[in-house]
Amino acid sequence: MACKISPGANSASLPGHPNKVICERVRLQSLFPLLPSDQNTTVQEDAHFKAFFQSEDSPSPKRQRLSHSVFDYTSASPAPSPPMRPWEMTSNRQPPSVRPSQHHFSGERCNTPARNRRSPPVRRQRGRRDRLSRHNSISQDENYHHLPYAQQQAIEEPRAFHPPNVSPRLLHPAAHPPQQNAVMVDIHDQLHQGTVPVSYTVTTVAPHGIPLCTGQHIPACSTQQVPGCSVVFSGQHLPVCSVPPPMLQACSVQHLPVPYAAFPPLISSDPFLIHPPHLSPHHPPHLPPPGQFVPFQTQQSRSPLQRIENEVELLGEHLPVGGFTYPPSAHPPTLPPSAPLQFLTHDPLHQEVSFGVPYPPFMPRRLTGRSRYRSQQPIPPPPYHPSLLPYVLSMLPVPPAVGPTFSFELDVEDGEVENYEALLNLAERLGEAKPRGLTKADIEQLPSYRFNPNNHQSEQTLCVVCMCDFESRQLLRVLPCNHEFHAKCVDKWLKANRTCPICRADASEVHRDSE
């Protein structure tokens, strides 16, 4: 005899999702025989369910709005099961021997009193844990309830783990608050049966709120282009996913099944070394190998060079931050061979490709490149000093008809040209350059006599050169200006100068006039 179970009038006001009521009824009916289908038993069951669910925490208002439906299970016309959410698969997955049948019920009647219909303590704790996990994760799947029912059934059929659709606005690092609730997934239940494709996100509570993504394929991150993720160790940004394509996705490098042994190094508390993930033997041949994982010691040795170079600017014109999305496909598109990124250092003429190159051969090559660049620089020319050769040549007493013709092309500035013209004007006023002193023949042609104090007619009584008085019988020399001097004193003066020591008159001109 088929048993028709209806929540009744009292169960319409029960809090929580209808799945809770159905699961509790099915579990109790599978463990104990059914009671006679009378009104008193139904009322007692409804009172028991109401008392059981009111003892737990009240769900959010959104869950209450979605729970206004009544399910009627019969053996003849079973209703389709509601869509199962990804986070409920772990809690509802049970062995076939324990899992109750949701479509067919036994025809036996229950003889157990209503007061003994209590769930075992272990099952109640598991139900409370599942409800808490679903209550914490309801803030992250706002867009999940808006999917059509047909799409939810299509998602449920493969029975594989599919993360909920996430809005593109949540992908930006600024949209993640520091205390964001993460989706709680029981990895032990998912992976105890073998190798299962699992995608998950580990959120680190960092000062900047940067998500730490694994090197595996994350479908929620593959809809928008975001710069690569990085881990913060002691204030230093170290890249985790070294992905060189021109349009970087948010760590969506590989899409491969990963065994459970690859995840503990990423979840462990060892802050000094990031272990590379183990490659599965089912790695697709058309995809590149996983991203390069460098130990922390190697990454830390690069930080002094970054502090010395003081601001390395990444040329990111070809890295858009959103707007373009890849079309949905079964496999991720094959990454084209991309050009390495270039870094602009302080030397604008010396750029090197430094993306993806390990650090030990990178630093000597960079230093040798800089030294080679410095050694190839040309020696700067000496500063220009204008020559005085034209001025000296203009002072030479060479007739223009006899002397050679000189042509000078002076590549000087305007100020130097003006100075040169001023020197030429001065040379024209002074005349031709003449020897400074007189020759010995010219000096001997000057008149001289012996001093006699008795017949001396000049008023000059001393030599201005030696400042001594004239004495008797001393040889005096008279210049054309009638100034008298000791012959020895004035001859020595005239050898270096051609003028009179007293009046500065030219002794040679006077001498020529007298001739």
Curated annotation (Swiss-Prot):
Biased amino acid composition, Basic residues: 115-134
InterPro entries named in the record: Znf_RING, Znf_RING/FYVE/PHD
Zinc fingers typed RING-type, residue spans: 463-504
Source organism, top-level taxon: Eukaryota
A single Gene Ontology CC term: sperm flagellum
Gene3D superfamilies named among the record's database cross-references: Zinc/RING finger domain, C3HC4 (zinc finger) (3.30.40.10)
Subcellular location, principal: nucleus
SUPFAM superfamilies from the UniProt entry: RING/U-box (SSF57850)
Protein name in the entry: E3 ubiquitin-protein ligase RNF38
Source organism of the structure: Homo sapiens
